[in-house]
Amino acid sequence: MPGVTVKDVNQQEFVRALAAFLKKSGKLKVPEWVDTVKLAXHKELAPYDENWFYTRAASTARHLYLRGGAGVGSMTKIYGGRQRNGVMPSHFSRGSKSVARRVLQALEGLKMVEKDQDGGRKLTPQGQRDLDRIAG
């Protein structure tokens, strides 16, 4: 369907399709520590899905498509959540900076993302074309 963009499709189906594309291409550089890491300080366990790095990369690429100029700090805010403190009140906790940084570096290696002159990262025209092609 011509003219279909990432904004027009269901986000969950798109992220799954993009993650499958990234895994099938085999070009995404996955760190060796992916099976032992938690994704945030507020998480109790590591992710159950063994392909979580591809899913996180797809989700990050989608976020950069929708709002470019996001860096490591804003990605930690996006993937943050509620920190439970037992009997004390809950507070917001950010996601892992190391995971966000490695995902952005891996997407830079695929030439989907580049550093923005105003700070943060943005999608390259090639990356935007890939995302629109997968959405269609």
UniProtKB/Swiss-Prot annotation:
Modified residues (N6-acetyllysine): 23, 111, 115
SUPFAM superfamilies referenced in this protein's UniProt entry, alphabetically: Winged helix' DNA-binding domain
Biological-process GO terms, alphabetical: ribosomal small subunit assembly; ribosomal small subunit biogenesis; translation
Omega-N-methylarginine modification, residue list: 67
Keyword Acetylation listed: yes
Top-rank taxon, per record: Eukaryota
Chief place of localization: cytoplasm
Keywords for the protein's UniProt record, in alphabetical order: Acetylation, Cytoplasm, Methylation, Nucleus, Ribonucleoprotein, Ribosomal protein
GO cellular component: cytosolic small ribosomal subunit; nucleolus; small-subunit processome
One Pfam match: Ribosomal_S19e
Subunit structure of this chain's protein: Component of the small ribosomal subunit. Part of the small subunit (SSU) processome, composed of more than 70 proteins and the RNA chaperone small nucleolar RNA (snoRNA) U3. Interacts with RPS19BP1; the interaction is direct and mediates the integration of RPS19 in state post-A1. Interacts with RPS19BP1.
Function: Component of the small ribosomal subunit. The ribosome is a large ribonucleoprotein complex responsible for the synthesis of proteins in the cell. Required for pre-rRNA processing and maturation of 40S ribosomal subunits. Part of the small subunit (SSU) processome, first precursor of the small eukaryotic ribosomal subunit.
Family, similarity comment: Belongs to the eukaryotic ribosomal protein eS19 family.
Protein name: Small ribosomal subunit protein eS19
Source species: Sus scrofa
